[in-house]
Regions:
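ABC-family P-loop ATPase nucleotide-binding domain
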Residues: 1-34, 244-253
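ABC family nucleotide-binding domain
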Residues: 22-238, 242
Length: 253
């Protein structure tokens, strides 16, 4: 069983496989995911080994059916693997139950989605406070941290605006501020520019690059090569396997 009583990063990292760098944030070994679709068994991921270190900016790419969405769901603790192991910041999450996964998800991961996922009747400030409500933070802590997070993404003068009073780029900035407010180990962005025009997309990617320069670990899931080019490392999935990793230029046949 996975240890759930270990609280310090050093203790958790000591339990990682010996060949894993001590600054690894994400480690997968032989990660597999299968689905039953009618009478057909679909192998969405087929033995993925991946290590992502602290303060990396990584793009996971691939065409439709490559397994990138499945990989995102597993990395984000939204799903569990059929086989294999997954460690997130030292937590062996591949063996955790639903309640423990939910706690890890809220603590360790900041999500940014293509469709923003903002509450339409709530202000930008209230939207950013939401993850801290789930974390049990006090009202003052929520307000102070949400204000700081919105200021960090350039929306210090838009805190009281509702989503329909903001542009698409501003709404995505609110979503990024919300993702950052709990100081997550990783920022996980799923097609974050998919609903934005090219100029606004460049602005959002520039923001990601600034956050990365400030020390944030970022994982970007995209099918767009020009967006992936902003990352410092690109991992290409094909047919559920790693076909290319720009950090090693290894091509799997």
């Amino acid at each position: 069983m996975a240890r759930t009583d270990i609280t310090t990063t050093a203790e958790r990292m000591a339990l990682l496989p010996a060949d894993v760098p001590r600054d690894a944030v994400i480690v997968t070994r032989n990660l597999q995911r299968e689905y039953q679709m009618g009478t057909e068994r679909v192998r969405a991921l087929q033995g993925v080994d991946m290590t992502i270190r602290k303060n990396e900016f990584v793009a996971i790419m691939g065409p439709s059916g490559s397994g990138k969405s499945t990989m995102m769901n597993l990395i984000g603790c939204l799903d569990t693997p059929s086989e294999g192991e997954y460690w997130l910041n030292g937590y062996r999450v591949s063996e955790l139950g639903d309640d423990a996964l939910a706690r890890i998800r809220n603590k360790e991961i900041g999500f940014v989605f293509q469709t923003f996922n903002l509450l339409p009747r709530a202000s930008a400030l209230a939207n950013v406070e939401l993850p801290m409500v789930y974390a049990g933070a006090s009202s003052k802590v929520r307000r102070d941290r949400a204000r700081a997070s919105l200021t960090a993404v350039g929306l210090g003068d838009r805190m009281d605006h509702k989503p329909n009073e903001l542009s698409g780029g501003q709404r995505q900035r609110v979503a990024i501020a919300r993702a950052l407010v709990n100081n997550p180990s990783i920022l996980l962005a799923d097609e974050p520019t998919g609903n934005l025009d090219s100029a606004t997309s460049e602005e959002i990617m520039a923001l990601f690059q600034r956050l990365h320069a400030d020390g944030q670990t970022i994982i970007l899931v995209t099918h767009e090569p020009d967006i992936a080019a902003h990352a410092h490392r690109q991992i290409m999935l094909k047919d559920g396997k790693v076909a290319r990793d720009s950090s090693s230029t290894e091509v799997v046949s």
